[in-house]
Each structure stands twice: as C-alpha cells, then as structure tokens.
Swiss-Prot record:
It comes from the Bacteria. Residues 52-102, 115-297 are annotated as: Disordered. Residues 492-495 are annotated as: G4. It comes from Alkalilimnicola ehrlichii (strain ATCC BAA-1101 / DSM 17681 / MLHE-1). The lineage of its organism: Bacteria, Pseudomonadati, Pseudomonadota, Gammaproteobacteria, Chromatiales. GTP binds at residues 392-399, 438-442, 492-495. The gene is infB. SUPFAM superfamilies: Initiation factor IF2/eIF5b, domain 3 (SSF52156), P-loop containing nucleoside triphosphate hydrolases (SSF52540), Putative DNA-binding domain (SSF46955), Translation proteins (SSF50447). Residues 417-421 are annotated as: G2. One of the essential components for the initiation of protein synthesis. Protects formylmethionyl-tRNA from spontaneous hydrolysis and promotes its binding to the 30S ribosomal subunits. Also involved in the hydrolysis of GTP during the formation of the 70S ribosomal complex. This is Translation initiation factor IF-2. Belongs to the TRAFAC class translation factor GTPase superfamily. Classic translation factor GTPase family. IF-2 subfamily. One of its GO terms (molecular function) is GTP binding. HAMAP family: IF_2_B.
Amino acid sequence: MAEDKVREFAETVGIPVERLVSQLEAAGISGRGPEDPLSDLDKATLLEYLRKGRDGGEQDDDQAPSKITLRRKKVSTLKMPASGGGGSGARGPRQTRTVNVEVRKKRTYVKRSVVEAEESKHDVERLERALIEDRKRAEERARREAEEAEARRREQEEAERRQAEAEALRQAEAEREATAETAGVADEADKAEPQPDPEAARLAAEKEEARRREEEKERRRLEQEARREREAEERAARKTGATAPAAKGKQKKGRESLSMGAGKPGRRGGKKGGRRAASGGEAAKQLQHGFAKPTQPVVREVEIPESITVGDLAQKMSVKAAVLIKEMMKQGVMATINQALDQDTAVLLVEEMGHKPVIVRADALEEEVLQDTSQAQEGDKAPRPPVVTVMGHVDHGKTSLLDNIRRAKVADAEAGGITQHIGAYHVETDRGMVTFLDTPGHEAFTAMRARGAQLTDIVVLVVAADDGVMPQTEEAVRHAKAAEVPMVVAVNKIDKPDADPDRVKQELSQMEVIPEEWGGDVQFIHVSAKQGEGLDDLLEAILLQAELMELGAVAEGNASGIVLESSLDKGRGPVATVLVQSGLLKKGDSLLCGTEYGRVRALIDETGKRVDEAGPSIPVVVLGLSGLPSAGDDMVVVDDEKKAREVAEMRKERQRDKRLAQQQAARMENLFNQMKEDEVNTVNLVVKADVQGSAEALQQSLANLSTDDIQVKVISSGVGAINESDVNLALASNAILIGFNVRADAAARRLVQENDVDLHYYSVIYDAIEQVKNAISGMLEPELEEHIIGLAEVKDVFRSSKLGAVAGCLVTEGAVRRKNPIRVLRDNVVIYEGELESLRRHKDDVTEVKSGTECGIGVKNYNDVRIGDQIECYERVEVRREL
C-alpha cells in the first residue's frame, strides 16, 4: 500500500490530528508529526493497540463498576401550629405540633475510562473502515497496473514480431539474390531446388521466445506479490473478527465481520444464532421489494385531444382530480370533474403540473381507417345504376307512381295514405336497373328530403297537374339545387279534368326550372300514376340523364355507403337500411356506421329475401350492428373490427364532450331563463317511433309548437316499443307518452294503468301534431278583449257639492252602463281611465242609459271634465286562445 501522511490519514479516519498523534505515541510510534509519513506497518500497530485497549477496558468494566450512585438522606423536624382551639371562652396557651421533614439527594459518578473506552471503540471502527478502504484502493491500483503492464507487453510483442518478420524477409531476399548470381557456376546448383537459409529465421524466433518467457515470468511475479499482500490483509481481518468479543445483553446476533462481503450474514451468533439465523436473514433480504422512492419528479408525456374532461386529464397525469381542480383554481378556472376543457387550457395545465403535453388529433385513427378503406377500393370503375330520389308535395302521387313502376301496392299500406319514411327500391327495366328513393312529402320530413337530395344522382320532382307548385315542391327544388343534382319533372294526375300542365311549367319557370321546350335543360314528362300513362317515357328520360352523367363506381373491395334509415326490430335487434355507393358489401364484413359498429350477420333486400352481397347503388337492410345509427351517417367496411370499435367509441366520446360543452355554455343562459320559467307553462313529451327518421321528424315538429307562454319539451326520443323505462321517465317528469307506429309492451301497459299515465298512439303525423296542438291550446290562458258598448258626448258641466264636476251628456252610440269602466277622450285622445261614480236621469239613479238619451255622469276621482269631451264606456271579455 502507498504511505499516507498523518494529517491525511486523520482526515480519512475522521478524527482530529492531535488525537491521532497521541494515539500513535501511546502505541509506541513516537516522533510523528502531522506531515510525517505513516506506513502500513504503523497503521497495523496502531490498530492492534486500539483493539487491546478496547478489550482491556471491557475487561475492567466486567470487574469494576463503570458508574457509582450515592444517595444521601437528611431528617429534620419542623414545628407548626396545631389546627383548632381550646375551650369556648378560655384563652389558654397556643398548641403546636412537630412535623418530620426528610430531604433525599442522589448523585451518580461515571468512570472516565468508560467514556474514553467508548471513544476508543469508535476510533477503532473508523480505523478499520479506513484500512478496508485502503485495501480496496490498493487492489484497484494493482489491478490497473497489471492491466497496463499486460497491455504494454502485448504492444511490445507485436512490435518485435513485426520487426523480426521484416528482418527475416530482408535476409531471405538477400540470399535469393546471392543464389541467383552463382547459379551458373555449377551444374548441381542448376539441378537442386533453391532453398533459403533458415538460420536468420531461427535466430529471430529464439530471441522472440526468450523475450516472451521473460515477460511471462515478470507478470507472474507481480500477480504473486499482489496475491500475497491480499491474503495477508484477509488474515489480519479474520484475526480481528476472531478476537472481537461477543456482544452482551440484548445486542444483535449475527454481527458482520470485517472480512465478509457486504450483505452476507455473520456465522457467529448468540444462543439462537447459527445457520438458521443466517438463512433467515438471507431469505428476508431476498423478500425485500425492489421499489425505490423517486428522487426527482416523474415527467410524463400527456396526450391531449381537442377536448378532454377534467377527470380524464387527471388520470393521464396520474394525479387525483382534486389536485388538478385546485391547480385550476389557482389559475382562475372553475370547473368540475366532468367538465370538458379545450386543448389550449389543457396544455397550459399540463405544463403547469410539470409534465410534457403532446397534442394529438382526435380523428387520426378515424382518418387512418377511412384511408385504408379508400385504398382497398382503388381499381377500375364500372358502370352503376343511377340513384333516383322521388320528391314533391304531400298527396301529389309520388308513392303511387313508384308502385306502378314496381308493380307493387305500397301506397295502400301506408297509414293515412302518406309516406312517413324513406323507401328504397331497385327496379329492373329493359334498359337497365334503377334505384328509387321515395321521400316523404309532409312538411315535418324536411331532414329526410335533404338527405335524399344529398345522396342521389337524379331527382324526379312530382307535381300534381291540378294543384301546381306547393310549399314542399319549392323546398324540393331548393334541396336539389343545393345538392347540384339534375332534375326530371313528372307532371302527375294529367288524367284529371282540371289538370293544367302549362300552369305547372309557368310556376316552375319562376323558380328557374326551365323546360326543354322553352330552351332550358329540364325534362318535363306527363304521367298518370293511376292509368300508367307516360311511365315508359319517364324511365327513358331517367336513363338518358344517367347516360349523360356517365355514372361509375368500383365494384370490388371494401364497401362504403350511407345509412338511409334505422329501426329496432323485436326479433332482429338494431337494423339499418343502407345504400351501397361503392365497393361490395358482403355477409361477415366488419361495419362502421357513425357511432355504431358490428359484423354483418345478414343482408336483406327490399322484398325481404336474404342476399349474400350487395354492389353499388343497391339498398339493403343490414343486421348485426351494436346499436341504431343515425340516418345520414356514413357506412364503411373496415378490415379490423377492433379498429371499428375504437373509432365508434371515440366518436361517442366526442359527442359526449360536445354535449357537455354545450351544457356548460347554456348554464349562464339558464340563470336568466329560470326567472321566467314560473311564468311559462311546460309540456313534456316522450316520443317513441318505429324508425329513426320518423322520430326525428316528430320531435322537430312538436318542438316547433312552442310559444312564448307554453314551451314544448321532448325530453326523450327513441326507436322501438314503449317499455317500462319510458313510462317511469314520463312519470318522473310528468310527461305525455306518444307512440308513433309502435305499441307499449305488457309491463309498460300495466304500469301505465296503475299510474294513470297519459299515453297516445298515432300512425299519421298529422294527427299527432294536431292533438298536441289542441292540448297546448287548452293550457293557454284566455285573452281579455275590450268591446266598446257606448259613447256619450259632454254638452254641459255642472258643479255638485257631493260629486264635484258632473257632466251633462248625450248618449250618441250604444249604451252607458254604471258598472262598466270608462275612458275620457278629448280631441280623440284618452286623457283619463276610470269608472263611473254616478249615473242619473232626471235626478234618478239608473244603471243604464241608451243611445239618444240625456244623462248626468259623475266620473270618480276626476273633476277636469270639459264641454266637448267624450266618455267612452267599454267592457272586458275573455276570449279562448288558439295556436
């Protein structure tokens, strides 16, 4: 080991330099100052002295006490006056009593050698640790020196080897040249093979071998010295552990020896020590968990979509929601756990909490799925049938026209003879296939007609020749122009006597729908749905328009389309009518429709037959979705059902966040609207319909019935039969149950009868709207109307001591009654409103004075009546209000 100075060794051990010098002198090492060197032998001598001193101190402690406690007791007396007195009147000597007082003192004296021994023990431990560290440093130094020597040896061997090879090559070259010069001197040299002299190579190899043996001997010598030094230190450490006394009292057993590695239990123990204790300690250490408390904050990458709730953001940062809400309060933002935050606010909060925000697009996965679908549809486009939407006003014969084309009787089966949902059919003709979409004509089905115009190729506008252009006809024209879809006008009912096709052309031309005969681009076809007249011309016009448009679609790959209608079938579950726009829809495909997903269990065409696949422009009913998609949602086929589920759930979450944000924005408005709610009556409705489109149309139409005095609220709207939950909701909210083409199940009917819930069934949307309108009208408060019943003109003014000014009047119109209110008019301007105080004729009080009769009128609390004024008498009448 390297020699240290006394001062450096004192710093290593951790004791003052003066104490180390005194301990060295006590150990017999004298004449050492702070700057003098201290060898390993001196350190071992000092350690041995300190150990002996500690052992001797402990033996002295066993023979003599380490501390002495002295107790001293001092007893004295104290006289105190006795309590109580002598006789009642006698004054005798004062009595006293004696009290013993004992004072105890206790002092403890500690032997100074015990303190010194304790300090010496600490010095020994520090010295042992210092020696162990020195040994480790020496081993590390020896290892490094051995590695460096080995590296130098290898480098030297490599250099000598290269030098020997070069020398041997030079000698061989010289010998070959000498041999070539003497080749012609003798014939034996010509016949013999020229062999180089190996003497130089042999000498070089012997030299190299001698050098290698010398280096190997030096390396072994260094390793033996290091090993001997290490063994000597280990023997000294084992000797230290053997001479150390056993611990007394309740000291820990299995004390670690200096020679043992870290973490290994000692062999020697107390009475219960030994292998069992050692193995127990080993097992306990193995059972310890490896968790370590973080020394610095954990920074997470938090993915933040466009909108996120407070609870979800706290979960992503692995903090409690209360902690995040407190942080938001510090930033001046008040929010609840379910409130949605925008992306910028969430980024600021994440940065404030010490994490790293990562902005993600909420529609990234959705775009990936749609891109995969579009790539799967790449290919050559094939001609496809045109999609034709039939639009027009109600009762203009749209469904009857389609029935005649399809040779079916759909209109007769419609409730009320009107269409109330989109019907989709495809028809085989001589010139090709055509897909027809029949839309409702009633004003309540605006959304259905708009959807029909968006997904169609051609619009057939049906106009009755006897009615002309009606409101829904104008609306259909607007939808077609907004969707930039070509139109074909079918002038229906031309077989009626009062039919006027020219008037239809005139009215449509005012809406910029110009016939071809007038120089426009719109075909006008005269048809009769009942007689079947003009149907071939209509089909020919449709197919001609389709040929001009050159319609085409990819017929292979994943299908995509749009949802026309959805309903809840009791035996089939959620079913959706979809129109395939491209690709091939097959049974077993994974489907994504808006916020719903599923696997296609069955495909059914409009005739009720099951089919295995459906191509472009073919409408089919799909079974197997997880729920009811909304009409108008896009339909795509995806390769992975898991991705479809993730996209559907993400869309639902986006809708939920949007709804929560709208609710939060409406809270401030509600604060002001709550003051008016007591004045406004509310009609609550629960609507259940057979299909999604009908429920949507009925909900919108009923909500539009609201007025300033009565508000109509559709608190729930759904598809399917009326169940118990609908009845319970109507009970809780005091609502009216409306079933549109659906009925209540047995449990719901029983609950309705028990609780007397207002339940109504409708099959025609007219009846539903009309009856709700009548119910609302009955809740309206009647209006008060004023009817003028008489008019009197002031001819003169008299003064009365009792009544003040009395007007002498002539009744010019109607009659003046005493109990009715009056108005005083001057120059046809009302200057006073009040009531009559007296009405007299010839000094007699009367209740009524008719036209053409003079009378005296006293106006209550009004004396400024002048000649020429008019007194108007009127009555208030309650009138029933209607919507």
